[in-house]
Amino acid sequence: MEYIETEVKFNLFDVQSLRERIMELGADVKSRVFETNMRFDDVHESLLRNKSLLRLRRDAKNRLTYKSEPAIKDDQFKTFRELEVQVSDFTTMKLIL
């Protein structure tokens, strides 16, 4: 799957009011999920220097994700081109990488 991820951060001064409003709008509360994230790079940190990321994540599913700068940058928000695939075996994929 390929898409553009846009990261937006907000200063929240009244978290409880926001939480209540979201619940009024019908939010579906999910339980917390612990996730394991592993980043991979070469000894020269080539991915990091090129503002890219290769990550293996385990939570409810196992996913391998590659993030890089998008072809068209957004001056207002932090954006990444993101490629992601589901992986059936976390441990084996870790060994491959």
PLM region descriptions:
Residues 1-96:
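N-terminal strand-loop-strand beta-hairpin
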